[in-house]
Amino acid sequence: MNIINNSENVCTGVKIWLCICCIGILIMVFIGGITRLTHSGLSITEWNPVIGIFPPVTEKMWIAEKIKYMATPEYKYITSNITLTEFKKLYLIEYFHRLLGRIVGLVFLIPFLYFMYKQKLSKNLIHRFILIAFLILVQGVMGWYMVKSGLIDRPHVSHYRLAMHLLLALAIFYLLWKHFLLSVVHQIKCNIKVTNTSVFYIIISLITIQITCGALVAGLNAGLLSKDIPFLSDKVGLNDLLFIKPWWHNIYNNPITVQFIHEVIALLILIIAVITLLVLKVRIFPMYLLLALLLIQLTLGILTFIYNVPIILASLHQVTAFILFASSIYLLHYVKLLQIKYVENKI
């Protein structure tokens, strides 16, 4: 994750484009959370990248779509009493999510082709943006692969595929955000000496793991479990955390264990961030920003858990995780600039 040596000078148009793409990903993540929490994701049973742009418009078309939905496990086991009006609401949420995905893809692709044609991008950037375009395509396929897992024999999607879908979004967001930072943040004014960047890589790694764990929590509906804290309550203990055999399967299949790990990692990130600020004395704006976002995210997470995963709170919790990740990348970028400035001053 060397984001300093690859600095690029690009025109203002490219900077604005990258910023818009990053915002587009964040909106997608937020809408994706709403789609999952309203149980809308399985309402569209086919994947038509081109024809799927057009929603049903007549009553006959809507009935045809509902008949397809009636063949799904979700309808058979959970929503068998759903009315056509209720089905339309679910369908349109999933439709909007897919449509927004197409729009974000085009918002990236069309300006990319334009800037490449106008020779506004270096060869290195062109190669990296081709990778991003490929990942966006893969993300579309992954989204359908995830949905398909809930159309066969279970009324819910695979939590593994859900996690992969979210991680692909994170990878795309990281690449876009990294290049935006490289194009915007070149110089800094403070002169703090930072000799070691290991702690910042640790923070980024833990946030990435935490986002993955959060996806598993969502996929396993772990947020709806008992609010008793393991080891601090007589109701939840070691046997509940490790009841699946072999024991390591609990890490990604046991909702109680996954939720517990999610909480532990959150506290660990907070402790490391506070130590970095107070003990290592990395008192710079990006560090304060990270800590503020971390406190906001912890508050959102606690409220989401206490109030049994309300849709808006849980969706905000999901998108704030990406913003927190972005702030950690910004922090690392800033620290590396500090190191370069320190070396230049010595010379």
UniProtKB/Swiss-Prot annotation:
Heme binds at H262, H317. One of its GO terms (molecular function) is metal ion binding. It catalyses: Fe(II)-heme o + 2 A + H2O = Fe(II)-heme a + 2 AH2. Its main location: membrane. It is found in: Cell membrane. The gene is ctaA. Keywords: Cell membrane, Heme biosynthesis, Iron, Membrane, Metal-binding, Oxidoreductase, Transmembrane, Transmembrane helix. Its cofactor is heme b. The lineage of its organism: Bacteria, Pseudomonadati, Pseudomonadota, Alphaproteobacteria, Rickettsiales. It is an enzyme of class 1 (oxidoreductase). Pathway: Porphyrin-containing compound metabolism; heme A biosynthesis; heme A from heme O: step 1/1. This is Heme A synthase. The chain crosses the membrane at residues 14-34, 96-116, 129-149, 162-182, 199-219, 260-280, 287-307, 311-331. The keyword Electron transport does not apply. Coiled coil: none annotated. Belongs to the COX15/CtaA family. Type 2 subfamily. One of its GO terms (cellular component) is plasma membrane. Interacts with CtaB.
